[in-house]
Amino acid sequence: MKDNKIIIFDTTLRDGEQALGSSLGINQKLQIALALENLGVDVIEAGFPVSSQGDFKAVQKIASKVKNSTICALSRALDKDIDMAYEALKVAKHFRIHTFIATSTLHMQDKLKKDFDEILSMAKRAIIRARSYTDDVEFSCEDAGRTPIDNLCFMVENAIKAGAKTINIPDTVGYTLPSEFANIIKILFNKVPNIDKAIISVHCHNDLGVATGNSLSAILQGARQIECTINGLGERAGNCALEEVVMAIKTRKDYLKGFYTDIKCENIFKTSKLVSAITNESIPSHKAIVGSNAFSHSSGIHQDGVLKNRQTYEIISPSAIGIHENRMLMTARSGRAMIKTCLENLGYDENTYNLDDVYERFLRLADKKGQVYDYDLEALMFLSYENEEENEFVIEKLSVISGNIPTACVCMRIKEELKTEACTGNGPVEAVFNCIARITNLKPALKAYSINAKSSGVDAQGQVDVDLEFKGRKFHGKGISTDVIEASAQAFVSAYNAIYRSLKVEERKMA
């Protein structure tokens, strides 16, 4: 291994899972582990085998299935933990035992009730026992960020002497700042005589929002392994996010000269979405690299710049992480250049329309809707102002019966005619969707469905967003209500009306 390769140690399945309200199932963990392997992660920390029988079985199954990544299990500096970790890992092609003990004065005195000499002795014994099972042993000085530096240096020196091949320096509570954390790593390299015999790793938490910054600062001082999680999942405020540190290394090669990872960056986005779906942890829209707004532009000035040269406002190409769709949002802040480009993409020559007229109508629509989609813009070309938001379909009544066979009854107004249908489904939302499809005689495919709370309390409003695909085109719908079924119905009908308007546009184009 070259000195400038940064080893990516992913702990989504161990530290990341600790942040979840409930444990993941064995097959869910395996699905994530296989995705991490496909992403190119070097080391996957699969769990803490001694913590539960379920975790033991999950680590064991992952160890038997993953072949290209080293599988790691966590253990305290206790014989039973280390033995259990080995039993879970021994079927793996490549495995690592990761043992740890707290080294800060606060943790030693108040949590462990031991002095430094006792902690040092426990650490050495644990490493020696782990080495009896494998040469690949990692040792962590828990709460290293608040450990007296002389104690930390002495602990690291003795851990390496005992046989640890990787020494992890965690900022367990996210207390240190980048320059401070960098200095800790620098001092270790200057004062620990056998530091060259081990790989120095860092594990940074995000309590002060600097986990990625701390990790990058450590690389510059000699750290060669970064412990991180997908989407920054982890205890409290989370961990260093894999996608952030990897893309920082890739993007800032001018500053982080020579450093690289083996991560297949084009798989980052789909791995992020998979972990989000399995853990039921939504990704904040403003999350760096993988948030829905990370590559979105709504300001007219920004959009104009991106249309001329993407690098004016994008330091990373969306395709670099596996995003291949346009994230230019049409809102009331969009300028004429954006509208003109969108119309060109829809196939309209600028000589066939009056841009000022279309833009004026666009602004009126954007003020009403917030976000305008390409099919809305196309409707402006063919429908009168009064019909731009014409709703062919309106829900008049809605009732749902839950139970063994969820059933919905929907009454809709189509022009002046009322139509009623009752349908079943796997759940009440699907039953409503089936009713609307039958009444409208349109059969789009549901591609995305999401719920977000718009307020708190028992009377909280929920917003439902749906994406329907019809004839190869996606249509968005939104609904808001204190009743999630009603909000879902509103969202479906909103999307169906968009489909209706697009069909009407096609008729006008053919006329």
UniProtKB/Swiss-Prot annotation:
Record keywords, A-Z: Amino-acid biosynthesis, Branched-chain amino acid biosynthesis, Cytoplasm, Leucine biosynthesis, Manganese, Metal-binding, Transferase
Record-annotated Pyruvate carboxyltransferase domain positions: 6-269
Record GO biological process: L-leucine biosynthetic process
Reaction(s) catalysed (UniProt annotation): 3-methyl-2-oxobutanoate + acetyl-CoA + H2O = (2S)-2-isopropylmalate + CoA + H(+)
EC annotation from Swiss-Prot or TrEMBL: 2.3.3.13
Keyword Flavoprotein: no
Family annotation (SMART domains): LeuA_dimer
Pathway note: Amino-acid biosynthesis; L-leucine biosynthesis; L-leucine from 3-methyl-2-oxobutanoate: step 1/4
Pfam families: HCS_D2 (PF22617), HMGL-like (PF00682), LeuA_dimer (PF08502)
CDD domains reported for this sequence: DRE_TIM_IPMS
Residues where Mn(2+) binds: 15, 203, 205, 239
Keyword Metal-binding: yes
Subcellular location per the Swiss-Prot or TrEMBL entry: Cytoplasm
Domain of life where this protein originates: Bacteria
Top-tier EC class: transferase
GO cellular component terms, A-Z: cytosol
Residue ranges, annotated region (Regulatory domain): 394-511
Cofactor field: Mn(2+)
GO molecular function: 2-isopropylmalate synthase activity; acetyl-CoA C-acetyltransferase activity; manganese ion binding
Family, similarity comment: Belongs to the alpha-IPM synthase/homocitrate synthase family. LeuA type 1 subfamily.
Function per UniProt: Catalyzes the condensation of the acetyl group of acetyl-CoA with 3-methyl-2-oxobutanoate (2-ketoisovalerate) to form 3-carboxy-3-hydroxy-4-methylpentanoate (2-isopropylmalate).
Subunit structure of this chain's protein: Homodimer.
PANTHER family: 2-ISOPROPYLMALATE SYNTHASE 1, CHLOROPLASTIC-RELATED (PTHR10277:SF9), HOMOCITRATE SYNTHASE-RELATED (PTHR10277)
Protein's UniProt name: 2-isopropylmalate synthase
